[in-house]
A protein has these predicted regions:
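Solvent-exposed serine/threonine-rich low-complexity stretches and specific carbohydrate-binding patches
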Residues: 6-9, 54-70
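C-terminal interaction-tip segments
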Residues: 1-25, 30, 34, 93-107
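Intrinsically disordered, low-complexity segments enriched in proline/serine/threonine
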Residues: 6, 49, 58-60, 81, ...
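A generic structural signal for short beta-strands and their flanking turns/coil linkers
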Residues: 25-27, 37-39, 88
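Beta-sandwich interaction modules
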Residues: 15-21, 62-97, 105-107
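Short, surface-exposed beta-strand/strand-loop-strand elements in extracellular ectodomains
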Residues: 36-58, 102-105
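Low-complexity intrinsically disordered segments
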Residues: 12, 22, 42-45, 50, ...
Length: 107
């Protein structure tokens, strides 16, 4: 059975590594974050962030922008189509001081 993968987004310039436990196709990336500073959040199969690259390579699955609005939380529900294998790593990269949040990947 496919399982969801929940990971905290640390905020600032950071990367979260999510190790996949079984082969499946991830179809949804739900992200919530505190909108504390301008920045970006990126879902990728590469351990190297491509935030700041205008035309990233195909390892970047999705990218979100965060404005400098300090009034609360933002959420995004992004449809994706990402086949993954057991023990493969998927990465969530972020920039923006204080953009703490949660990433949920699911089938």
């Amino acid at each position: 059975m496919a399982r969801p993968y929940v990971a905290d987004i640390a905020g600032g310039t950071a990367t979260v590594t999510i190790q996949i436990q079984a082969s499946q196709t991830l179809r949804r990336w739900f992200v919530s974050w505190m909108n504390a500073a301008a920045g970006k959040i990126e879902l990728s199969t590469s351990p190297t962030s491509q935030i700041g690259t205008a035309q990233p390579d195909p390892s970047v699955i999705a990218r979100l922008s965060s404005g400098a609005n300090t009034t609360g939380q933002a959420v995004a529900d992004v449809p994706i189509n990402l086949p993954v294998k057991a023990f493969q790593n998927v990465y969530v990269h972020c920039t923006g001081a204080g953009n703490l949040g949660t990433s949920i990947l699911s089938s």
